[in-house]
């Protein structure tokens, strides 16, 4: 139905807001709904929520609000934090996702419409073409990715020095990682 994120934003004339991001609803959730509604085909979905206070609370809310998804939270169940998950990848010889290697705290789409001011200024530096295209899309759609107490913040008007620096997710292998994956050879 939709070719990509850009197609969703243009056709829906909506980026994000109180009801979430248009691309999340139409490119991720719609696919899940179609699969989970097929009788006998849905054993649950694995969610990558990591073991930290915010994500545990998010998982609890998600399970309460979406029981039909039969959510599975293996990282939380095994008490694996995001830094430990990255450490496990490293120990297994699996390349850490590019966005983490570039210093981002999440591995979302490049130019995720849910990112904050600091995130967008980092995107401006790291991916100037993507930043410019999203700024163009905002004008085409008539909506913005960013808002503050004064209203909309257009990317093409965003002060390059505004916003907090993105905090990189550092790779780690704590005692949990070491115990769980003692047999994985270090690389």
Describe the predicted segments one by one:
Residues 1-187:
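Nucleotide-activated chemistry modules centered on ATP-dependent adenylation/adenylyltransferase
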């Amino acid at each position: 139905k939709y070719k990509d994120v850009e197609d969703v934003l243009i056709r829906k004339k909506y980026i994000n807001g109180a009801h979430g991001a248009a691309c999340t609803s139409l490119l991720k959730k719609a696919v899940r709904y179609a699969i989970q509604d097929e009788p006998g085909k849905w054993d649950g979905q694995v969610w990558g929520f990591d073991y930290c206070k915010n994500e545990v609370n998010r998982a609890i809310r998600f399970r309460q609000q979406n029981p039909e998804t039969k959510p599975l939270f293996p990282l939380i169940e095994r008490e694996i934090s995001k830094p430990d998950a990255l450490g496990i990848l490293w120990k297994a010889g699996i390349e850490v996702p590019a966005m983490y290697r570039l210093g981002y705290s999440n591995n979302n789409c490049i130019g995720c419409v849910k990112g904050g001011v600091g995130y967008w200024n980092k995107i401006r530096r790291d991916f100037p073409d993507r930043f410019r295209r999203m700024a163009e899309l905002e004008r085409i759609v008539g909506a913005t990715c960013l808002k503050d107490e004064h209203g909309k913040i257009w990317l093409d008007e965003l002060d390059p020095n505004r916003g907090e620096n993105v905090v990189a997710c550092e790779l780690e292998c704590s005692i949990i990682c070491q115990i769980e994956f003692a047999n994985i050879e270090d690389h």
